[in-house]
Curated annotation (Swiss-Prot):
Region DNA-binding, residue ranges: 78-88, 193-198, 220-225
Organism of this sequence: Homo sapiens (Human)
Record's keyword annotation contains Metal-binding: no
Name of protein: Recombining binding protein suppressor of hairless-like protein
Region Disordered: start-end pairs: 26-48
Length: 517
């Protein structure tokens, strides 16, 4: 069932939860659009405000007009010393996606004048201990074949004068015309002096790489920065790109499983393990390969220590004949090919590689912020963008509540189920609680439902700014038969009361949560 068609937006909604309506004095308090509730207070917008918002939320759900900002960066950064500048590798990059970026506002003079190109410009830098952004680099966004806008900060670095062990990247987006869209922060990045040369152990897992984590691979011929190429995917094929990198999920593979099947295997990846790389965007995979440690341009065949950040490694295709050097993943200009290694004449447990077969591995992080400005009538920035991480259902019967765990929550947010606003309580920047609307708000014939109803969940700011989420809520019905159906006896006079009790019991025990992918 389409939640967008649940009710007429011109009619103020009836109470949608099992809680009673507030009295008139409470409603007057909450009719203030800019009201900031105290933690622990249940709030709901006024009926007039809800009616206005409801039509806009419905349009956002139907037209899919969200805008997404995705920041992709490495987990660690190597510190620069003296006058040197060790630019972050791979360089932090930003993707702007979603149809909302292509909506042309009527008030936008630039669009009216017929100008083309990105509607925003970006500036990226490091946060500082004082909380303000340091020197920034301007991002030049380019449109990709998949319609995403891509920008890259190639000259960011952290000097030895900065004594922090961790920092964040700060992205500032400004709309054409000068209005600030918002300031977005990356995940924490760990600062290291140089790649660890010691034998790794699981006693200190800070820099180890676990199965299922995201990594990037890059190659530098003769250790020259200008020759850096990144493993990436373009047009459905693996390539070695000089300008754009991709994140891959590193799975511990099972040699006895079907290709593409990754049974859950916890733990840290060790050299000598069979692994598989899966592109996080396209899902395209490389064949299972054995990851080898590299030292002095040789693959070490007898090393089984844990892999560490910024280590040099090689990927050997299994099935090499005994006594041979093995076949390895290699780049040739922009192509990804196979390289036939030679056995080391002096040491049997080594294979001789070329420069193009030696890769540097590093863990990556990404963070996404989604919003839609088409509903809001505000000049305020869209940030901080709330992020939902988990949901926790409690109660049932007359009242079922749902707690949202995440970050960047504030008292001006309301939880929406489809186009229905839920009574919301702000607890902390990491917790919101809402009352689950009755299923009758989405289907008048809920007593006769035979299929689950899945409702998308979102957050809406007091000024109408819409924040979609990846979460949905599913009402799962009991099997019921509509009265009057051929061959079915008429229900008893107390059938409605019985059905209501069944509904309440079902409400208590049979809610299910799903994450949309």
């Amino acid at each position: 069932m389409d939640p967008a068609g649940a009710a007429d937006p011109s009619v103020p909604p009836n109470p949608l939860t099992h809680l009673s309506l507030q009295d008139r004095s409470e409603m007057q308090l909450q009719s203030e659009a800019d009201r900031r509730s105290l933690p622990g207070t249940w709030t709901r917008s006024s009926p007039e405000h809800t009616t206005i918002l409801r039509g806009g939320v419905r349009r956002c759900l139907q037209q899919q007009c969200e805008q997404t900002v995705r920041i992709l960066h490495a987990k660690v950064a190597q510190k620069s010393y003296g006058n040197e500048k060790r630019f972050f590798c791979p360089p932090p990059c930003v993707y702007l996606s979603g149809p909302g970026w292509r909506v042309k506002p009527g008030q936008d003079q630039a669009h009216q004048a017929g100008e083309t190109g990105p509607t925003v410009c970006g500036y990226m830098g490091l946060d500082s201990a004082s909380g303000s952004a340091t020197e920034t680099q301007k991002l030049n966004f380019e449109q990709q074949p998949d319609s995403r806008e891509f920008g890259c900060a190639k000259t960011l670095y952290i000097s030895d004068a900065d004594k922090r062990k961790h920092f964040r990247l700060v992205l500032r987006l400004v709309l054409r015309g000068g209005r600030e869209l918002g300031t977005f922060h990356s995940r924490l990045i760990k600062v290291i002096s140089k790649p660890s040369q010691k034998k790794q152990s699981l006693k200190n897992t800070d820099l180890c790489i676990s199965s299922g984590s995201k990594v990037s691979l890059f190659n530098r011929l003769r250790s020259q920065t200008v020759s850096t190429r990144y493993l990436s995917v373009e047009d459905g094929a693996f390539v070695a790109s000089a300008r754009q990198w991709a994140a891959f999920t590193l799975h511990l593979a099972d040699g006895h499983s079907a290709q593409g099947d990754f049974p859950p295997r916890e733990g840290y990846v060790r050299y000598g393990s069979l692994v598989q790389l899966v592109c996080t965007v396209t899902g395209i995979t490389l064949p299972p390969m054995i990851i080898r440690k590299v030292a002095k341009q040789c693959a070490l065949l007898d090393v089984d220590e844990p892999i560490s950040q910024l280590h040099k490694c090689a990927f050997q295709f299994p099935g090499s004949p005994p006594g041979g050097g093995g076949t390895y993943l290699c780049l040739a200009t922009e192509k990804v090919v196979q390289f036939q290694a030679s056995p080391c004449p002096k040491e049997a447990n080594r294979a001789l590689l070329n420069d193009s077969s030696c890769w540097t591995i590093i863990g990556t992080e990404s963070v996404e912020f989604s919003f839609s400005t088409s509903l809001a009538c505000t000049l305020e920035p869209v940030t901080p963008v709330p992020l939902i991480s988990t949901l926790e259902l409690s109660g049932g019967g007359d009242v079922a509540t749902l707690e949202l765990h995440g970050e960047n929550f504030h008292a001006g947010l309301k939880v929406w189920f489809g186009d229905v606003e839920a009574e919301t309580m702000y607890r902390s920047p990491r917790s919101l609680v809402c009352v689950v609307p009755d299923v009758a708000a989405f289907c008048s014939d809920w007593r006769w439902l035979r299929a689950p109803i899945t409702i998308p969940m979102s957050l809406v700011r007091a000024d109408g700014l819409f924040y979609p989420s990846a979460f949905s809520f599913t009402y799962t019905p009991e099997y019921s038969v509509r009265p009057g159906h051929p061959g079915v006896p008429e229900p008893a006079t107390d059938a409605d009361a019985l059905l209501e009790s069944i509904h309440q019991e079902f409400t208590r025990t049979n809610f299910h949560l799903f994450i949309q992918t």
